[in-house]
UniProtKB/Swiss-Prot annotation:
Pfam families: GWT1. InterPro entries: PIGW/GWT1. It is a multi-pass membrane protein. Disulfide bonds: none annotated. This is GPI-anchored wall transfer protein 1. Its main location: endoplasmic reticulum. It comes from Emericella nidulans (strain FGSC A4 / ATCC 38163 / CBS 112.46 / NRRL 194 / M139) (Aspergillus nidulans). GO terms for biological process: GPI anchor biosynthetic process. One of its GO terms (molecular function) is glucosaminyl-phosphatidylinositol O-acyltransferase activity. The lineage of its organism: Eukaryota, Fungi, Dikarya, Ascomycota, Pezizomycotina.
């Protein structure tokens, strides 16, 4: 890469301060709004059954391109885009309620009831939707941020501040924590069987982390050898997000032993966040991370990645705490005290600036509060428009699969099932585009054409993997 252009690229994503949380909420609300319109079309008109070309294109427009437009063309008017999405949904609801009430989500009457291990852990379409929407906006943002059509206030803040991409990084980790609760719940259901020792669990988690750590090494090698533009203050000289993701499972297993003494992942998450924040405020750790010169040792060169890992660990544990509550039976009124606690903690942490670079306590609380709100919205949409998903607890697995398939976008299902592979492809395509296209000098029309093509390609990869029944999720 040309040295002058590389310097311009690095300056383009440096020293940014982010934007307002209200605007971030408005932009991210596009995902639930799109799912709301999709759900109305499906529950009232069965528009996506069968899933032909028209259904595929509409699905792509609603669940992928709407998010792309929210972060580009409609970045200055996200509320307008939300209105454009929900208005037709309400019109359909008003005109079809009486005619479609009895058929909007009628469960099939074929399979017999099944019981056994895992029967109390139903499939939740809203969890699939939530994780897939997060994956889509992440994949879009990692390439869009290199174009001028993507507002700078959405890019990662340098030291302090809130931005869309700052939230995306934490949400990626939080969602991983949510789904990790399923394995914990299943192991607790099998209480009679011999439990694995800490060493066995730790070894197993390391094996699962190896692919992510390998990807981290591949990315490190590629960036250094291709002279790719890099933002060193993001994670450090050698560290990258794949390393953070890869080291989380083994460290979480170490906390699993503590969970027997403190049987609350909420408390564990908060304890990690608070202790880390105390260290930041009462020692020189904060200034060491933010302003100290980089020494020759590995810790100094990668201090952002190493120490922010503690914040991401707290976020992962917070996600697992949420998963432990919602996976067994969805979101219910009994879970509202948890929401109240998070609101109180968010207000308490508001006196300290949010820092994604530090992954400090306010950042942890912001990410947890946002993701709980998103889960609530997706669950609310599902509960209202697909009530049969939450009924017939004694029906068989075949019935459950048919009901969940009816209530879930095929594109969102594909992104959720192929999460790791899609994220890898998105990173490879982002690198390829940046090495072949002068993204800083591209006009808006060409930038949007590239981004739409990129979105279509990663969607095609996700659908192809799902069609081949290949599951490589994060």
């Amino acid at each position: 890469m040309d040295p002058d252009y590389k310097s311009r690229k690095e300056a383009f994503v440096s020293n940014l301060t982010g934007g307002s949380i209200l605007e971030i909420n408005a932009v991210t609300l596009v995902a639930p709004a799109s799912v709301f319109l999709w759900s109305v079309l499906q529950s009232r008109l069965s528009f996506f059954t069968p899933y032909g070309p028209a259904a595929l294109i509409t699905d792509f427009l609603l669940n992928v391109l709407a998010i792309l437009f929210a972060t580009t063309f409609y970045s200055s008017a996200p509320w307008l885009l939300n209105l454009l999405l929900v208005s037709p949904a309400f019109l359909i609801l008003m005109n079809s309620r009486s005619r479609r009430t009895q058929t909007k989500a009628k469960p099939p009457q074929t399979a017999t009831a099944q019981h056994g291990p895992g029967a109390s852990l139903p499939i939740h379409p809203f969890l699939t939707t939530y994780r897939a929407a997060m994956m889509i906006i992440t994949c879009i943002a990692i390439l869009a941020v290199d174009f001028r059509v993507f507002p700078r206030r959405f890019a990662k803040a340098e030291n302090w501040g809130t931005s869309l991409m700052d939230l995306g990084v934490g949400s990626f980790v939080f969602s991983g924590g949510v789904v990790s609760a399923r394995s914990v719940l299943k192991s607790r259901e099998r209480g009679a069987s011999p439990k694995k020792t800490l060493t066995q669990r730790f070894t197993s988690s390391v094996r699962h982390s190896v692919p992510l750590l390998v990807l981290g090494l591949v990315r490190l090698y590629s960036v250094k050898n291709l002279d790719y533009a890099e933002h060193v203050t993001e994670y450090g000289v050698h560290w990258n997000f794949f390393f953070t993701l890869g080291f989380l499972p083994p460290f979480v297993e170490l906390f699993e032993g503590i969970a027997t003494l403190i049987p609350s992942y909420e408390v564990l998450s908060l304890a990690v966040a608070v202790l880390y924040q105390v260290a930041l405020e009462s020692t020189d750790l904060k200034s060491y991370i933010l302003v100290s010169p980089r020494g020759p040792d590995l810790l100094s060169k990668n201090r952002e990645g190493v120490f922010s890992f503690l914040g991401y660990l707290a976020i992962f544990l917070a996600g697992r705490a949420t998963g432990m509550r919602i996976i067994p039976g969805g979101i219910s009124p009994s879970n509202t005290p948890q929401q109240a606690r998070k609101r109180v903690l968010t207000r308490y942490g508001a006196n300290i600036p949010v820092s994604r670079r530090l992954a400090n306590m306010p950042y942890v609380l912001w990410v947890a509060a946002f993701n709980n709100a998103q889960l609530f919205l997706f669950c609310l949409i599902e509960t209202i428009l697909f009530p049969s998903v939450h009924r017939a607890s004694g029906s068989g697995k075949n019935d459950e699969a048919k009901r969940t398939d009816f209530a879930t976008s095929p594109i969102l299902t594909a992104f959720n099932r192929g999460g790791l592979a899609v994220f890898l492809v998105a990173n490879l395509l982002t690198g390829a585009v940046n090495l072949t296209v002068p993204t800083l000098d591209v006009d808006k029309t060409r930038a949007m054409a590239i981004l739409v093509g990129y979105a279509a390609l990663i969607t095609g990869v996700a659908l192809g993997l799902n069609k081949a029944n290949i599951k490589i999720s994060l």
